[in-house]
A protein has these predicted regions:
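Catalytic-core region of carbohydrate-active enzymes that cleave or remodel glycosidic bonds
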Residues: 1-102
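Generic serine detector
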Residues: 7, 15-18, 24, 56-59, ...
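Charge-patterned, long linear interaction tracts outside catalytic cores
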Residues: 88-133
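C-terminal beta-sandwich/jelly-roll accessory domains of carbohydrate-active enzymes
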Residues: 115-281
Length: 281
């Protein structure tokens, strides 16, 4: 088990930034025995985390299709090879705000031998990110497709084929190009993605995913949430997400609830809005 109630947000956010930063997908192969005591699972382990598994499909589609455009600019700093290999001298001054909006990285230098072209570093990104954060409280990527609201702890993905509203979104409204998202839960990860190479606007089928927190039955944490006191047992309990999503396209949709195998279980409640949007509850 993994004592982190908000871990569902990890996969779609990492997938989005892999596109922005042009990171190559990495496969972690490992063996793991079953254990009896409480332990903290690895970040990439979806086997025992149902909310992560539920979002693996949309996260994979985003990465494979390249839904998020690559940043064409970035901010870089130099670091010596000796400093890079030291746990004491390895220090960088890349602002966190810049990391949210564009590529960042280092150029290794040693005896005038340099790996990477530091002249490609866009120094203006530091002031640009700082000004944006100060004036709006939000950080929007240079591509315009990713937005982090630092104050309200929310994250938006807004591309042609995948859109999402993630984080502590309860009581707020995520306004995206093809979807308006409103959730009553304090924390949720809600994504809408095309199931083809077409955009959401033109897709024949869409996948709407809505997950939140989870825990084992009778699982207990310390008051600060940093320590698991009781691991609990099966069945795993997943929080039901309540609210609605307005799909703002010209299509007429049927909406179905799916089980863990992707099979239809029942029709979801829908309602046509005056502006032509289809509201799914």
């Amino acid at each position: 088990v993994e004592p982190l109630l908000y871990s569902a947000e990890g996969a779609p956010i990492m997938s989005a930034y892999s596109g922005l930063l042009n990171l190559s997908p990495i496969v972690f192969a490992f063996a793991q025995d079953y254990v009896e005591d409480a332990y903290m699972g690895v970040a990439f382990d979806t086997r025992e985390v149902p909310t992560k598994a539920a979002l693996s499909y949309v996260s994979g589609l985003m990465a494979i299709r390249g839904d998020v455009a690559e940043s064409q600019t970035g901010y870089y700093e130099t670091v010596s090879r000796s400093a890079a290999s030291s746990t004491i001298d390895y220090k960088l001054d890349i602002p966190t705000a810049v990391k949210r909006i564009a590529k960042t990285g280092v150029c290794l230098t040693d005896n005038e031998d340099q790996t990477g072209d530091i002249t490609k570093s866009n120094e203006a990104l530091k002031d640009y990110a700082e000004k944006m954060l100060k004036e709006t409280g939000k950080l929007t990527s240079v591509t315009g497709e990713l937005r982090t609201d630092m104050e309200n702890e929310t994250f938006e993905i807004n591309t042609e084929r995948t859109q999402g509203y993630i984080g502590k979104i309860g009581g707020k409204k995520g306004v995206l190009n093809n979807a308006d998202i409103c959730a009553e839960n304090n924390f949720a990860v809600i994504t809408l993605t095309s199931l083809s190479e077409s955009s959401i606007e033109n897709a024949d089928k869409l996948l709407l995913s809505a997950v939140g927190r989870w825990r084992n039955t009778d699982m207990r944490f310390s008051d600060d949430g940093n320590k698991m006191l009781l691991t609990g047992d099966t069945p795993m309990l997943c929080e039901q997400i309540t609210g609605y999503v307005d799909i703002k396209t010209s299509g007429n949709y049927e909406a179905w609830c799916l089980d863990q195998s992707g099979q239809r279980t029942k029709a979801a409640k829908t309602e046509k809005q005056e502006n032509g949007a289809t509201r799914i509850y």
